[in-house]
Amino acid sequence: MPKASHHDLRFAFRELLASGSCYHTASVFDPMSARIAADLGFEVGILGGSVASLQVLAAPDFALITLSEFVEQATRIGRVAQLPVLADADHGYGNALNVMRTVIELERAGVAGLTIEDTLLPAQFGRKSTDLISVEEGVGKIRAALEARVDSALAIIARTNAGVLTTEEIIVRTQSYQKAGADGICMVGVKDFDQLEQIAEHLSVPLMLVTYANPNLRDDERLARLGVRVVVDGHAAYFAAIKATYDCLRLQRGLQHKSDSLNATELSHTYTQPEDYIRWAKEYMSVEE
């Protein structure tokens, strides 16, 4: 069977965005998971920033991974992927000029699209970890990303955190990013269909939601009617892999009968030690949670 080129996969993702359906992403974190996802018929995968941080650094999602480390993992996936893979490019690893470099490197890695978010990352001295950059700076980043891409089929998706904004503020931000030329709008933290409907009526570009399996947003037909084309439920496959590794090694050591077995969430918490990072951020940066 002939292999699809990176451009072919980008075109396939463009067709997905132009369709009238809603698709759920496979969590893709290495070449093997990319092959499995494609073989199982997933239409699109995503390399999450949080998952990349876990896979590469065994660190929590505190913007610790570097662009080069993230691109290396995306490149490994891009060598074998036969489904469109989106890259969660966080804040673009810096200012608008850094965003341009991010787009250049991830395009070469073979991703079909990438999200650039407007969270103030990495966490800044004396600021809240959920603070956002200004709309003007966010617009500049999207315009810079569009300028940097070579293959026009590469999708540039603007992402914002609906969980820390009023609905009116979300509309202002997303309309601004749409006007700047974003190929799609990604939102995390949308509460329910009522809020989504209020936002969607002001937008014409395809929408992407990070829902973490929010039970209030479980209706693919309704999502599709509102323009949602991509849904990220989370990264269950990655955490299942962590759990399977833990259980297998416990069995190998003869510890399977002990009562202190951990679930996937507990394992992630135990082995990334987020309390240390939170304490350091408070002590050295006066960062508020």
From Swiss-Prot:
Substrate binds at residues 50, 159, 235. Its cofactor is Mg(2+). Keywords: Decarboxylase, Lyase, Magnesium, Metal-binding. Binds 1 Mg(2+) ion per subunit. Gene3D superfamilies: Phosphoenolpyruvate-binding domains. Pfam families: PEP_mutase (PF13714). It catalyses: oxaloacetate + H(+) = pyruvate + CO2. It is an enzyme of class 4 (lyase). InterPro entries: ICL/PEPM, Oxaloacetate_deCOase_bac, Pyrv/PenolPyrv_kinase-like_dom, Pyrv_kinase-like_dom_sf. Homotetramer; dimer of dimers. The keyword Lyase applies. Its EC number is 4.1.1.112. Coiled coil: none annotated. GO terms for molecular function: magnesium ion binding; methylisocitrate lyase activity; oxaloacetate decarboxylase activity. It comes from the Bacteria. This is Oxaloacetate decarboxylase. Catalyzes the decarboxylation of oxaloacetate into pyruvate. Seems to play a role in maintaining cellular concentrations of bicarbonate and pyruvate. One of its GO terms (biological process) is propionate catabolic process, 2-methylcitrate cycle. Mg(2+) binds at residue 88.
